[in-house]
Amino acid sequence: MRHSNKIRDEEMVNNTRLNXXA
């Protein structure tokens, strides 16, 4: 299940960008 890990990482980055807001 490596694909799930990659998708999770991308979601985490997207969340950080939104939080960030920047």
From Swiss-Prot:
Residues 13-22 have a biased composition (Polar residues). Residues 1-22 are annotated as: Disordered. Residues 1-11 have a biased composition (Basic and acidic residues). Transmembrane segments: none annotated. The N-terminus is blocked. It comes from the Eukaryota. On the 2D-gel the determined pI of this unknown protein is: 7.5, its MW is: 38.5 kDa. This is Unknown endosperm protein L.
